[in-house]
A protein has these predicted regions:
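Acceptor/aglycone-binding surface of glycosyltransferases and processive sugar-polymer synthases
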Residues: 4-20, 37-119, 145-155, 160
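The conserved acidic donor/metal-binding loop of glycosyltransferases
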Residues: 30-34
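Terminal low-complexity segments of carbohydrate-biosynthetic enzymes
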Residues: 48-49, 105-106, 159-187
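Catalytic donor-sugar/metal-binding loop of nucleotide-sugar-dependent glycosyltransferases
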Residues: 90-91, 115-117, 126-144
């Protein structure tokens, strides 16, 4: 068990856990198990096929959503996905599904670079993974909406948008360059 020094955000907690992980494959999942843990085998299979990172997706096969989000949350998710595409060039159907697996060496390469400590950490780690040439595979998984989420789309949505801009700024300013992430002129 890894303890955190207070509540510093989900991104901080995931980074802390991944940097302490010992297995060959490191997995994180939402605490509410929106994707059943049995779905982890799909992510492991993707890694065994050659992916460095396997990310669960709610949107590649929507029929796997056993309980859908309210429409306002779906709309927020689509808008955020479009913003990621424009600002960071990410082309994934779903970066925010809290079900991701990493080869340990891939996790050890990108999580030390992570700067975002709140909800916007997912696009940052995928942005970094792409920039250092890691292979990311998106995998459709079973998923059910949970009312217990702590994410508030309107309040946290603005913060997440600002975090996307911060990731772009960090890249342009060369904040990731020391760790081998391509320089801004190559972005």
């Amino acid at each position: 068990l890894v303890a955190n020094p207070g509540n510093r955000g989900i991104g901080f907690s995931v980074r802390n856990g991944m940097l302490h992980a010992r297995g060959d494959i490191c997995l994180f999942t939402d605490a509410d198990l929106s994707s059943p843990i049995t779905e982890a085998q799909k992510l492991f299979d993707a890694i065994n096929r050659g992916a460095d990172i396997a990310i669960g997706s709610r949107w590649l096969r929507t029929e796997l959503q056993t309980e859908r989000q309210p429409l306002y949350r779906q709309a927020f998710g689509r808008i955020f996905n479009l913003a990621q595409r424009i600002i960071l060039g990410l082309r994934f159907a779903d970066t925010q599904c809290g079900f991701k697996a990493f080869r340990r060496d891939a996790a050890q390469r990108i999580f030390p670079l992570q700067k975002i400590e709140r909800w916007g950490f997912d696009p940052e780690i995928l942005f970094l993974a792409r920039r250092v040439g890691l292979r990311v595979e998106e995998v459709p998984v079973l998923w059910a909406h949970s009312e217990g989420t702590r994410l508030h789309p309107f309040r946290d949505g603005l913060r997440m948008f600002v975090e996307l801009l911060r990731i772009r700024w960090n890249a342009m300013a060369g904040d990731y360059a020391a760790a081998g992430v391509p320089s801004p002129e190559k972005l």
